[in-house]
Design a protein with these regions (language model features):
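Asparagine-centered strand-capping/turn motif at beta-strand->loop junctions
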Residues: 56-62
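Short acidic, flexible loop segments centered on an aromatic residue
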Residues: 63-82
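Short, solvent-exposed loop/turn segments enriched in Ser/Thr/Gly
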Residues: 48-55
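Short, solvent-exposed, Trp/other aromatic-anchored flexible loops in extracytoplasmic proteins
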Residues: 87-142, 156-158
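C-terminal motif of bacterial Sec signal peptides marking the signal peptidase cleavage site
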Residues: 15-18
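Bacterial N-terminal signal peptides that target proteins for export
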Residues: 1-7
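Beta-sandwich strand segments
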Residues: 84, 140-150
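Bacterial signal peptide processing site
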Residues: 20-23
């Protein structure tokens, strides 16, 4: 009897979860407080290094809690389709992000960037310098990744 009750409870829970409409994150997530620029990654092998960086928050604009919310940040040069670095960020656990709530600020930097012996400002002004863009993707629970934003990286240095 207890076993049958437990089975019925699990089936009811599974049905109620799977019947909730999926949130279209391209509309259900607002990317807020966005800033981009070139992070001073210090000196590597005797050369100055700059990497593209983004700081952002996600705001839940839907009417549902978004459990296990994640972001994938993809860096690309504006002249190429090839990925130039990426990073995966877990924003919430099973507690989710409540409707109207905002995640803490996230700062993500590419692993790849530019190195040179010039000053950082001279590197940004170099004729060989290629600008970067950043694409943000989000997913929650077992949904598919959806693009929620794309940003160009201005030629500004982010101070530490």
């Amino acid at each position: 009897m207890v076993r049958a009750s437990l089975c019925a409870l699990f089936v009811a829970a599974a049905l109620s979860t799977s019947c909730a409409p999926k949130v279209d994150l391209s509309k259900g997530i607002q990317v807020v407080d966005v800033s981009t620029g070139w992070w001073d990654a210090g000196v590597v092998d005797g050369q100055n290094k700059l990497v593209p960086s983004i700081t952002f928050k996600f705001k839940n604009a839907s009417d549902q809690a978004l459990d296990v919310l994640q972001a994938n940040v993809v860096f690309r040069r504006v002249t190429e389709d090839k990925e130039w670095g990426s990073s995966f960020v877990k924003l919430t656990g099973t507690e989710g992000l409540a409707p109207g709530a905002t995640t803490p600020s996230q700062t993500v930097k590419s692993q790849l960037g530019y190195t040179g012996t010039e000053s950082r400002q001279q590197m940004l002004a170099n004729s060989q310098f290629v600008d970067a863009k950043i694409q943000l993707f989000a997913k929650y629970s077992n949904t598919q990744w959806q693009k929620v934003g794309e940003y160009t990286v201005p030629r500004t240095i982010i101070e530490k």
